[in-house]
Amino acid sequence: MRNEITGGSPSLSRAWFALAVLALAAILGITDRQMLTLAVEPLKRDLQLSDTSLGAIVGFGPILFGALASPLLGWLTDRVDRRWLLVACVLVWSAGTALCGLVTQGWMLFLCTLTLAVGEAGLGPVVYSMLPDLFPPALRTAANTIFFAVALFGAGLGIAGAGAIFSVAAPLAHALSIEPWRLAFLLVAIPGPVVAGLFALVGHPPRGGTADQHERAQETLAHYWRRSGAMLACLIVGYAMAAFYVGAILGWAPVSLIRDFHVDVARSGLYSGIAVGGGSALGLLASVVAVRCLRARWGRLLPVVIGCAMALLAALLLLMLSFATSTAMLLACMIGIIAAYIAGAALTPTLLQDIAPPHLRGRVVGTSSLVTYAFQAMSVPSVGAISDALDGAPYALLKGIVWLGVPAAVFSVILLGLVLRTFRTRFEPHCEVGAQAL
């Protein structure tokens, strides 16, 4: 199923259909995950959990478990029919979401969130391994950008949709004599089997790649790591540090709206959705403008340059979050931080695809996911622990985000700065990243 560039090609039509279903799966996964964030307060009340326990159950545990599962799922991605692997992942995380609505103990919720996390961990390796084989080189970066953009805007839609589901569930739950959050989890799990069925219709493309990648077709993972590992490690950890402070924002800012600014659950979901969607749009636009204006100057270094600059901007915005005493100011800082992160991360998928041979692509993406998940896993419970230690102090959650987020952003700047210094001699990608993108 090698693609041609003709728009009327049946294989290309199937590729666009596959991209649409992959994007839909990403939106569904985000919605399921954000449902946990918006349900924090009723879960805390009904299951009698502390912020630290909630951080471990909703954040640390599932994210860490997903991180550990990512390399295995990346290995499977490189060896099995990626179509059926994704179908299995969607069904697994949908089952975990539905079971969250049936729990009565904290440990039961923990097991359900682990199930959800394992299913979602397979999405990244499958998508970023499959897109280069679905689309010809001339359309690959465009396909990556479209999926990245849809997933970004889907994050806003996901959290807003989760809030809307809570609103719909409330009157129905009253009629059924159950807690609204339980019904909300059951409702949000319904689309999962439908999306899985749609993707089952997609054919499995043969694994391909560029001429340079074919020359390295027999390269082992160990040899690849010896050749490119040092700078790859700096790059992955640098972006993971950015994911750390963004994870803290996404995990606790909606809760802070409810707890510190007395916003109800539905409006918290709506406001947070607007902030995530608006920040995503601004970040993607900033990335497009930067590519068009700076590509000639920086060439293949551009993704790292943008990432370094945006991490520095995020550090300044996190400092401003210390002074947020109104809903509007919190949302403004949230929009800016998310925009800075997105602008830096927009070209990362294409960069990883360019530096990885086709037969190792799933494992490279899986390794990147493992590191990113690990840092995200630490962000949510760490902020929760600071909140508990402050014992009811005003804006305790925001203080935790700032105290941990600023050092993370600074460390991201340092690591990406190291990449800039040695990129040309120790970490050579095989095409100009961003030259065709956007």
Per-range role (PLM):
Residues 36-37, 228-284, 345, 349, ...:
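Extracytoplasmic gate region of multi-pass secondary transporters
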Residues 67-106:
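Conserved MFS/SLC helix-loop-helix module at the cytosolic interface between two early adjacent transmembrane helices
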Residues 147-201:
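Helix-loop-helix hairpin linking two adjacent transmembrane segments in secondary transporters
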Residues 4-12, 204-234, 260:
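Juxtamembrane intracellular "pre-TM" segments in multi-pass secondary transporters
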Residues 91-104, 311-325:
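C-terminal ends and interior cores of transmembrane alpha-helices
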Residues 112-151:
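Cytoplasmic helix-loop-helix junction between adjacent transmembrane helices
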Residues 39-68:
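Extracellular/periplasmic helix-loop-helix junction of adjacent transmembrane segments
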Residues 57-73, 274-287:
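Central cavity-lining transmembrane alpha-helices of secondary-active solute carriers
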